[in-house]
C-alpha cells in the first residue's frame, strides 16, 4: 500500500477534512473523496488519535487489565482503522480471533482493512455491513471486544441505536473520544446507562454513580491529556501541520470509557481496591499550591494541594506528568497526603 509523506500531502484536502470534522453529524455524507484523503488523514489527524489510544492502553497496562482472549475485535466507526490497529499492536494479534471493521464509508473500511493486513499478516480481517439499526452488528463468532473511537459527534439517532446493539452483544467496550465537555457528558450518560450490565474498568476508580452529575459539578467534565511522542514538538513538519490545522500538539485532550461485562472474569483484572481517587483534567497550578478535581466513590471535589504536603506530585502536576490514580487523604477541602498508584508485582 502506498503511504503518504510530508512531501505528498494534499494540504487543501486536509483543510477540507478538518472543517468536516468540526461540523460533525451536520455535515452529512462521506468525508472521503478519494483513497488519498484516507491516506493523508491516517498520516496526520489519525496519528493524534493514536496518541490518545496509547495513553488509554498504557493506563490499562498499569492497572493490570488486559483484553480477554479468544474473541473477535470490532473497530466500530473505524475510519482509517487507527484504533483497531493500536489495540492489535498493544495486546498482540494472537489474543483475538479476527478483526472486524465497520464504518458508514465503504472506502474507509477498505482502507482500514488494507492497513490492518499490511501490519498484521495472517490476521483474519472482515468487513461488517448492514444499515439502520443493524449497521455493524456482528453475525456470530462470539461476544466481541469492541473498540469505538471518535464517533459521538457524527452519530445520528439511527447510528446511536446501531452502536447500542453492538454494545449489547459485546463482552468488553473500550471507547475513546475527544476531551470536550459535550463528548465527556455523552460518555458519562452511556456509563450510567450500562452500569448494571458492565463493570466500569476505567477511567473511574469506583462503581458508584458519576460524581459529575451533581449540580455543583455541572460545569466540569471528565477529561485527560495524552502526551505526543518524544521529540515531536521539535519536528518542523509536525509543527507546520499543527499550525495549519489549528491544533495545539502539546495538548491532546481525550475522554474514555472501558467496560467489561459483569461476571466475565472473577476477580476482574486491574480492579482497584476501595480508597483510590482519580485526578481529572483541569488542574490549576499556582505558586506553592495547586487546585485539582479529585474523583472518588464519594464524589468529585475541587481540592487544594499544597506543595509542602506533596512536593513530588506538585512538581508532576506542574510539568503535566502526574499519575492520575492517587490515594488521597484530606482535611476539608485540602489534600494532606497522597500515594501514587503502582501496580503490585
Task: For every predicted segment, state its role.
Residues 144-158:
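A short SAM/SAH-binding and catalytic strip from SAM-dependent methyltransferases
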Residues 1-28:
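N-terminal auxiliary segments of SAM/dcSAM-dependent transferases
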Residues 239-345:
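C-terminal lobe and adjacent flexible extensions of AdoMet/dcAdoMet transferase-like proteins
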Residues 170-179:
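Conserved beta-strand signature within the Rossmann-like core of class I S-adenosyl-L-methionine
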Residues 80-94:
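Conserved SAM-binding loop of SAM-dependent methyltransferases across substrates and taxa
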Residues 69-79:
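Conserved class I S-adenosyl-L-methionine
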Residues 105:
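Conserved SAM/SAH-binding beta-strand->alpha-helix loop
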Residues 29-56, 63:
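Class I SAM-dependent methyltransferase Rossmann-like catalytic core
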